[in-house]
Amino acid sequence: MKRSGCWHQRMLLSLVLLTWTHVTFSALIRSHNFSRWPKPPCKMYYPIDPDYEANCPDVKAYVCATNGLTYKNECFFCIDRWEFGPHIQFVKYGKCE
């Protein structure tokens, strides 16, 4: 009886480890389609007072715009769009090439 219980435990452990390995490595290998992500919510970053100095977070989550610039994150992109006009459009998340 002990041998069959040990065999079942090994089989269960093997299945759990194989499943965990598959999930982990498939997430690493899978390409991320940034075009399917939603556009930045710029209204969230627009200052209420025009004299207000924007305080964007120091986070690297690059945004590429139609002006060819890569912004550090969506906050910097949205503030530039607010200051310089709607002709600056969102292209994709990630660096411009």
UniProtKB/Swiss-Prot annotation:
SMART domains listed in its UniProt record: KAZAL
The keyword Disulfide bond is assigned to this record: yes
Subcellular localization(s) per the UniProt record: Secreted
Key words, A-Z: Disulfide bond, Glycoprotein, Protease inhibitor, Secreted, Serine protease inhibitor, Signal
SUPFAM superfamilies: Kazal-type serine protease inhibitors
Role description: May be a serine protease inhibitor. Essential for sperm maturation and fertility. Inhibits sperm acrosome reaction, protecting sperm from premature reaction.
Protein name as it appears in the record: Serine protease inhibitor Kazal-type 13
Annotated organism of origin: Mus musculus (Mouse)
Lineage of the organism: Eukaryota, Metazoa, Chordata, Craniata, Vertebrata
This protein's encoding gene: Spink13
